[in-house]
Amino acid sequence: MGKSLYDKVWDLHKVRTLPSGEDQLFIGLHLIHEVTSPQAFGMLRDLGLRVSMPERTFATLDHIVPTDNRKRPFKDTLAEGMVDALKKACTEQGVTFFDLESGKQGIVHIIGPELGLTQPGMTIACGDSHTSTHGAFGAIAFGIGTTQVRDVLATQTLSLQRLKVRRIQVEGKLGPGVYAKDIILEIIRRLGVSGGTGYAYEYGGSTIEGFSMEERMTLCNMSIEGGARVGYVNPDQVTFEYMKGRPYAPKGEAWEKALEYWRSIASDEDARYDDVVRINASEIAPTVTWGITPGQAISVKEKVPAAEDVTNESERALIREALEYMRLEGGKPIEGTKINVAFIGSCTNGRLSDFREVARRIQGHRVAPHVRALAVPGSMEVARAAEAEGLDRVFREAGFEWREPGCSMCLAMNPDKLIGDELCASSSNRNFKGRQGSPTGRTVLMSPVMVAAAAVRGEIADARDVFGI
């Protein structure tokens, strides 16, 4: 019986099985940022320990960085202190730090791949929920907490429970105006926000194989929103072509050896899976969330669910809670719901291909007068490339604010926040209560092109209609 990529990579990195039943796993790459890492360095300092393998740890700034004015010192003294603490710790411990002057700063899950740090067959850890993004390369990547960040810094290992593996097979051709974001929202909608608990998700099938690396990253990024700690795609020629020539990618003879390893860790044709889910891509439409979890999603042409339409009382309660918070009426179309803010960016959809796709759609259009629209590149490299192509001008001419790189409005850890009851059409990954800064602010998740359509119309709209897709 063959093995899945997950099992191959796990077995190659397993140090030993602990008395608890967990496995001690060697971590090939450790990515850190300013929010969950300074405290871990402090724990190390208190214990009199040093970073075990500083050459395998890389730091950046993303969560708290202002995207309108990055001049230091930041107005937020707490944020300024966190940046200083991380910089000091990295200097003391010999850890590479991509700060605002490095030219390489950006969201951790965007700079890892673009620098070639993220590689197939690796185990990757980061103190951030969306570390599963790196699984797009055929890596086993997972988010960890601050104490686990400490453990990786001190030992380059983690104690983890082995997961089951679910194969999600997506076949068929996507319709016009349908993107990777729509697929992952549909997967979460079908399987639920807890459906992946205890599983690693392996994404495959002709649809996924036809995706670019950036589309695969969008898909893997939101695995955790469906309860799966790990999500990955088997590496292939698309992966290798993306990686070749990246700053930290292997070179020369090392490249050829790496290719041999990378090819070997792909799932065997006769690999055994604990579960298989099959999805027809042609049936997926542009998808938006209507509630307060990513699983509360519908096609843009559907009506918002009504509590009375379900028989399960707990489901009814969840619907009522979501409708009350979102100020929506069950049984009414989601299309036409007024928005106040539009946000394109985040580790889900803040890459060059995202901005290219939106730019080609919004030319000749203008953001509605009452909408505040932000376009936030995910890294300095993305910003440079987009600006070299003139994409920033397209966004500005359409009425978007073109910002500096950072996590921005994905979460409430920087100045980019919702105010009051504002509703945001967002290309990010979470629509929890208060996620974007205001305790009554509302978030509707969708693809970047759908965000652009909402920005232009001033309300949730079908991008296929707005842009004639």
Swiss-Prot record:
[4Fe-4S] cluster binds at residues 347, 407, 410. GO terms for biological process: L-leucine biosynthetic process. It comes from the Bacteria. Pfam families: Aconitase (PF00330). Keywords: 4Fe-4S, Amino-acid biosynthesis, Branched-chain amino acid biosynthesis, Iron, Iron-sulfur, Leucine biosynthesis, Lyase, Metal-binding. Binds 1 [4Fe-4S] cluster per subunit. It is an enzyme of class 4 (lyase). GO terms for molecular function: 3-isopropylmalate dehydratase activity; 4 iron, 4 sulfur cluster binding; metal ion binding. Pathway: Amino-acid biosynthesis; L-leucine biosynthesis; L-leucine from 3-methyl-2-oxobutanoate: step 2/4. Its EC number is 4.2.1.33. InterPro entries: 3-IsopropMal_deHydase_lsu (IPR004430), Acnase/IPM_dHydase_lsu_aba_1/3 (IPR015931), Acoase/IPM_deHydtase_lsu_aba (IPR001030), Aconitase_4Fe-4S_BS (IPR018136), Aconitase_4Fe-4S_dom (IPR036008), IPM_dehydratase_rel_enz (IPR050067), IPMI_cat (IPR033941). It catalyses: (2R,3S)-3-isopropylmalate = (2S)-2-isopropylmalate. Transmembrane segments: none annotated. Its cofactor is [4Fe-4S] cluster. SUPFAM superfamilies: Aconitase iron-sulfur domain. Heterodimer of LeuC and LeuD. Belongs to the aconitase/IPM isomerase family. LeuC type 1 subfamily. Catalyzes the isomerization between 2-isopropylmalate and 3-isopropylmalate, via the formation of 2-isopropylmaleate. This is 3-isopropylmalate dehydratase large subunit. The gene is leuC.
